[in-house]
C-alpha cells in the first residue's frame, strides 16, 4: 500500500501540537486564543499537518483559530482514552486504578469518542484523519484499554466519519 492509498493529501511536514505553556495543562488552565494564534502562525511557517491528542476546549480553540485565521494547517484529530483495565506492568506505578475509576473512565472514553465524531463533522475541511487512543495498548501504559474495546471505538468512529481512522500505538503489541 502507498501513502496516497489512504490519504488524499500531499506529503508535507507534520508535528504534534500542544499549546500548553508554563502553568497550563490538560484539565487545568489552558492557553488563550491569542497564545494559540501566536503558536499556530509560527507552526504554519514550517509544518502543514498537526496532531492533536484529545477533544477538549483547547482542541476546539485550535480548530477555531485555524479556521478563523485561514491557516494552511490540516489536523489529525485524536480521542484520548483513559484506563479501562489495570496494568501492573506500568513502570512508574500509575497503571493500577480503583474499580470505580475504571468504570468512570469507560464512560469518559465513550464521551471522548462521541466528541471526536462530532468535531470531525464540524471541521471536515481541516480534519484529515482521526486517531482513537494514544499508546493505550502498549505493555507499559498507565491508561490501558483492552484491544477489543479499542477496536470497538475505532469501528464506531469509522461508522460515523468519512476521514481515515487509526489508533496511535507502538507496533510491538500487534
Task: Describe the residue ranges of each PLM region.
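Boundary/entry segment of secreted carbohydrate-active catalytic domains
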Residues: 2-38, 42
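Conserved, mostly hydrophobic/aromatic
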Residues: 15, 50, 130
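Active-site beta-loop-alpha junctions enriched in small/polar residues
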Residues: 18-20, 55, 78-84, 132-137, ...
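A conditional alpha-helix N-cap/helix-loop micro-motif detector
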Residues: 29-33, 55, 109, 147
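Catalytic domains of carbohydrate-active enzymes, especially glycoside hydrolases
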Residues: 35-58
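Short, well-ordered alpha-helical microsegments
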Residues: 58-62, 173-174
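Substrate-binding cleft of extracellular glycoside hydrolase catalytic domains
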Residues: 62-163
